[in-house]
């Protein structure tokens, strides 16, 4: 599942960023493997807006498609 598959209000952990360019861009936002993010908004054919800590980031759809995520442990959707 990728970041662009999530819906508003979802909390997820960044699992993997395989593309080195995307990883470098995400690190600039303070987002890396293991980071917990909350989806604030998913704009149709536009960016995914996420919150990490007190910061909000608009991540373009192409970048969001390159970021693999999982739901946190204990989330029923992991079953």
Where are each of the predicted segments found?
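Compact, glycine-rich, soluble single-domain proteins
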Residues: 1-79
